[in-house]
Design a protein with these regions (language model features):
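Residue signature of alpha-solenoid helical repeat architecture, marking inter-repeat boundaries
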Residues: 46, 50-53, 87, 121, ...
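Canonical tetratricopeptide repeat
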Residues: 54, 95, 129, 162, ...
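Register position in tetratricopeptide repeats
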Residues: 61, 68, 102-103, 136-137, ...
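Start-of-helix register in tetratricopeptide repeats
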Residues: 50, 57, 91, 125, ...
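Flexible helix-coil transition and linker loops at the boundaries of alpha-helical arrays
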Residues: 39-48, 81-91, 185-197, 294-301
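Residue-level recognition of tetratricopeptide repeat
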Residues: 57, 64, 98, 132, ...
Length: 435
């Protein structure tokens, strides 16, 4: 009963932030003023296509700043109205593609990006959104071509950061880091929005954390928060880093701040894992219940968290049948490597290791340097008694990033030691028999 009251209180607090705002959203004032400005223009002239486009742009920026999906819905209405008045407005069509992308409607996003390109083939941002949509459905070569075309048209924060993301997926972490560093410099020179620069700084911090380089990761997470104090991504990234440093009280505080800005299920799950790590099981349970509560609310808000929930259920060995169904549903519209990874992990947890092997091999196909992927592969091969491959991938997980998870990094280390002991024991027994 106490746990349920806690969940309700958290949700009420979250909704209050959305409905009434907070002093912590002060940096969004400029965007709010732009929204008001365009609304005033439209009251004077309801047929002003440019004002509808400007309003749509400002609403998208607001959605990115605070993570409220309703702003994307409002942006869609404004952009469609702009296109009704001026059907050849390539910018409005491009922005509409971005709205669809943000809602995980990737086919619609790609289709609208292509329409924007037909209207204006010199608009690099349209190629960028097309590449984003293609990337999410696993069409990596086509995504690369779109990003390269964007880069030909504009060397910007947005083109550099997109190429960096693709390079990271392909295992070129040095190239990704170099592109992100350049993206930040170019973005500052061009006076791009603070939220966009902060996003890139957070991404660079995440790249460093993925390699276990905590000092560099900390530098860029803090830089992101200095650029844009309400960067919930940077707050969560810094929370993960503090957990890796065993500064658990700070990690808890940072996760709570991130959740207060945007209640993402993976943030609540990560906070729960920190509580579990330090033996505060009651508070861990509260966060795990919050994950499911957010998942249920997301259905009402038309926000898809299938992947996050499928990972959460599998990681915590709950609702495994439902979790597998969620994971497999991902493949219906999203065939990137992480769709295959979440399916592989859920198949493994449901005792279907042979099928899991096929899926994890697809997840590993790009050469991505992700300790979580390697951990999943190691555990799957371990269950198949493929000891050499299990050792290889568990060792790669720990060498890539020994801090990749507060609980599973330790699980990986224990499994690797067990495998090494069994191999040594088999060798000793073999020598004894030979003697």
């Amino acid at each position: 009963m106490k746990s349920r009251k806690y969940i309700t209180a958290i949700i009420v607090a979250i909704l209050a932030l959305y409905v009434f705002g907070s002093d912590s959203f002060a940096q969004g004032t400029r965007t709010d003023n732009q929204i008001t400005y365009y609304q005033q223009l439209l009251r004077r002239n309801p047929r002003n296509s440019k004002a509808y486009y400007g309003l749509g742009d400002a609403l998208i920026r607001k959605a990115r700043e605070i993570g409220d999906p309703d702003y994307f819905n409002r942006a869609e209405e404004a952009l469609k109205r702009s296109l009704e008045i001026a059907p050849n407005n390539a910018g409005a069509m491009r922005h509409l593609a971005y709205v669809f992308y943000s809602r995980h409607e990737f086919e619609a996003a790609a289709a609208h990006a292509c329409k924007a390109i037909e209207m204006d083939a010199t608009d690099g941002d349209s190629y960028g959104i097309l590449g984003d949509a293609l990337l999410e459905v696993g069409k990596y070569d086509e995504a690369k071509a779109a990003y390269e075309k964007m880069m030909q048209l504009e060397d910007s924060l947005y083109s550099r950061s997109r190429l960096a993301g693709l390079k990271s997926l392909q295992g070129d972490t040095a190239g990704s880091i170099a592109d992100l560093e350049r993206a930040i410099a170019v973005g500052k020179e061009a006076k791009q929005p603070a939220e966009s620069i902060a996003w890139t700084e957070w991404q660079l911090g995440s790249d460093y954390f993925a390699l276990g380089k905590l000092q560099e990761a900390e530098r860029y997470y803090l830089q992101s928060l200095q650029t844009y104090p309400n960067s919930y991504r940077a707050l969560a990234g810094l929370a993960q880093l503090r957990g890796a440093q065993k500064r658990y009280d700070e990690a808890i505080d940072l996760y709570q701040k991130a959740i207060a800005i945007l209640p993402m299920p993976d943030y609540a799950a990560a906070l729960g894992d920190i509580y579990a790590k330090i033996g505060r099981q009651g508070q861990a349970k509260q966060q795990y219940e919050l994950v499911e509560y957010i998942g249920r609310l997301s259905i009402l808000n038309k926000v898809l968290y299938n992947r996050e929930l499928a990972y959460f259920y599998a990681d915590h060995d709950i609702k495994l049948k439902e979790s597998l169904e969620l994971a497999q549903r991902e493949l219906d519209y999203r065939r990137d490597i992480y769709a295959y990874d979440v399916v592989a992990w859920n198949l493994y947890k449901n005792g279907k290791a042979e099928e899991a092997r096929d899926a994890i091999e697809k997840a590993l196909s790009l050469g991505t340097r992700d300790a979580r992927l390697f951990y999943h592969a190691g555990m799957i091969y371990h269950s198949l008694h493929a000891k050499d491959k299990a050792k290889e991938y568990l060792a790669r997980a720990l060498s890539t990033n020994p801090f990749f998870h507060p609980i599973f990094a330790e699980t990986a280390a224990q499994a690797l030691k067990q495998l090494e002991r069994s191999v040594q024991q088999a060798g000793v027994e073999g020598q004894g028999q030979g003697g």
